[in-house]
Every structure is written in C-alpha cells, then in structure tokens.
Regions:
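Extracellular/periplasmic catalytic domains that process cell-envelope and extracellular macromolecules
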Residues: 2-4, 26, 111-112
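Short active-site-adjacent helix-start/loop capping segments
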Residues: 19-21, 42-43
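Alpha-helical segment that forms one wall of the substrate-binding/catalytic cleft
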Residues: 37, 41-118, 122-130, 172, ...
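Peptidoglycan cell-wall recognition and remodeling modules
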Residues: 20-32, 36
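Low-complexity, Gly/Ser/Thr/Pro-rich intrinsically disordered linker/tail segments
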Residues: 156-191
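Catalytic and substrate-binding regions of cell-wall glycan-acting enzymes that process beta-1,4-linked
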Residues: 113-166
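Short, functionally critical alpha-helical segments immediately adjacent to catalytic or ligand/cofactor-binding
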Residues: 3-19, 93-95, 117-125
C-alpha cells in the first residue's frame, strides 16, 4: 500500500495497545486500529475485494442518507467482526492510510508525515486537511476554536493543565510524540 509499517505499528499501539479485542467505551470503535463502524464499512467496500473480501464488499450498500449499510444482520456482524482480526484490520488500516496520504499530499502539495496520517485518523480526512492547512498558515491558532465538537469530546487533547487551550502546533506535536512513543514501544524505528 506504500504506507510505512512503522506508522501502522505506532497507530495500533496508540489506538489499542496492540489489543485486537479493544473496544471504545464512547463510540463504535473496535479492534487494533479502533475503526468505527462507518469507517470500517467504507474501507472494506472500497478495498475489500483486493484482499479476498469480495463477499464483504459486495454486501455493503449505501442508504439514501449516505450511510453505509449491510441488509443481512449476520453478514453485518461478520463484516464488523473483521475489525478484530489483526491481519484484516492491518490491511484495511494500510489501505485507509494510503487513501488519506494521497488526498493529504494532493491537498497540501507536500509529502504527508505519519502525524498527518494520524490526524486524518483522528479528525477524519476533511478535518485533517482543515487542521493542517490552518496550522501551516497560523500554528498559534487555538485548536478548540477550529474544532469545537472534537475539543468537547477530547478535552485532554485540546486543553492542557488547568483548562489552558492548546494551539494547533501544540496539538500536532502531542500527536507526533504519542505516535513516536507508541511505535518505539513495539520496536518500530525511524518515524
């Protein structure tokens, strides 16, 4: 997929502590890479057939509201359970990161870093592009002002000790450090 294996190791360590059965208490996120249901269905629909998951990809449809659906409940459970299979989850995480990498590079006109990719995982692709463009223009801008919903849900990221709001550069640096530490803790080098 062209995505650095060390990045994927770091992401899995940060997201789940390398636990294939990890589940978020605040969302539908599950597995090594903590895919939420809609993100998982999207990446499986787009790339599943390339990796022997044609049966899954062809069972994922899109409703009039734009949400991805699987009409058969047992098939839906089987597709979502794949988030807990380390090989499948890693392949789909790599494909998802590769898609994000291409889009970020096209949008910013530079090579995407591992931290850029992690921002896309955290904020979604549109949010990451918005974050990165704003950070390049004004690194001292307060992150919570730009992403109020994300800040409410992730106060430890957007605010420091005593509720002090963090700048875009500070948030980015925290993610960079977190990703580097996660990768190093599982033996990855050179992020």
């Amino acid at each position: 997929t062209g995505v650095d294996f060390n990045y994927l190791l770091g992401q899995a360590q940060v997201e789940s502590g390398m636990r294939t059965d990890a589940r978020a208490s605040t969302s539908s996120a599950s597995g090594l890479y903590q895919f939420i249901e809609q993100s998982w269905l999207a990446v499986v629909k787009k790339h599943g057939a390339e990796h022997g998951l044609g049966w899954a990809a062809e069972n994922i449809g899109q409703g009039a509201n734009g949400r991805l659906t699987v009409s058969d409940p047992s098939t839906r459970r089987a597709i979502l359970a794949l988030r807990n299979d380390p090989a499948t989850a890693s392949l789909m995480a790599a494909e998802h990161a590769a898609d994000n990498k291409t889009s970020i590079e096209n949008s910013l006109g530079r090579t995407a870093t591992g931290t850029d990719l992690y921002m896309a995982h955290f904020l979604g692709l549109g949010g990451a592009r918005n974050f990165l463009k704003n950070m390049e223009a004004n690194p001292g801008k307060i992150g919570a002002a730009l992403f109020p919903a994300a800040a409410r849900a992730n106060q430890n990221i957007f605010y420091g000790a005593g509720g002090q709001p963090r700048t875009l550069a500070e948030i980015y640096d925290r993610f960079s450090t977190k990703l580097d530490r996660g990768a190093a803790s599982v033996g990855a080098v050179g992020l």
